[in-house]
């Protein structure tokens, strides 16, 4: 989920009031519902033909945590749209895996963490990449099994430019590094759910 300036989020509201509302938020979910939910629905109505979520494949327990894996066209908006649709179903928003190559300013790094994002390190050596993948896998398993918090992760690095939306092998290998048991047990532990985007942008 995301946020811009206070005139966009709360038009006509003085900054002092906006600041008080922000300080009143005690959790990341409260922050997202206060500042991001309405903005994202407003944006969706302006630039898409509509958003829908087929949640029938999910168990009835809305408090359960899942790993959502999908293609993406805009990593912030796609995961944000998923979150507001989940909120409408009475479910929690998702933590988002976001590459550090997108954190071009220090304030962006702080802001995405407020919005339940965790950082995926890029431009690493092979050894560093293996260590980072193992660390992230352990965190994702912990987030699903201990924090009971759902996660969204792109199925491949970058956008698919040739209509090839197959999940990158390295993503599945990363998920299987952490956790206990054999590879199948580890993948089942993160309760992964494959999604595919069908939004059509309005002209």
Roles of regions detected by a PLM:
Residues 136-188:
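Loop-centered beta-sheet repeat module
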Residues 1-6, 193-200:
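Conserved small/polar residues in nucleotide/adenosyl-binding loops
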């Amino acid at each position: 989920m995301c946020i811009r300036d206070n005139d966009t989020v709360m038009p006509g509201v003085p900054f002092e009031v906006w600041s008080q509302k922000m300080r009143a938020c005690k959790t990341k979910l409260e922050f997202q519902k206060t500042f991001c939910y309405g903005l994202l629905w407003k944006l969706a109505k302006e630039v898409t033909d509509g958003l829908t979520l087929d949640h029938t494949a999910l168990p009835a327990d809305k408090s359960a945590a899942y790993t959502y894996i999908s293609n993406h066209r805009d990593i912030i908006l796609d995961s944000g749209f998923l979150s507001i649709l989940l909120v409408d179903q009475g479910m929690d928003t998702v933590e988002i895996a976001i590459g550090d190559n997108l954190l071009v300013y220090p304030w962006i790094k702080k802001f995405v963490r407020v919005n339940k994002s965790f950082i995926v390190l890029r431009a690493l050596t092979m050894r560093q990449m293996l260590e980072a993948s193992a660390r992230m896998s352990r965190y994702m398993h912990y987030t699903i099994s201990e924090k009971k918090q759902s996660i969204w992760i792109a199925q491949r690095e970058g956008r698919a430019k040739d209509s090839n939306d197959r999940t990158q092998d390295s993503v599945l290998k990363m998920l299987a590094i952490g956790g206990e048991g054999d590879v199948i047990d580890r993948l089942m532990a993160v309760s992964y759910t494959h999604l595919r985007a069908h939004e059509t942008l309005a002209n």
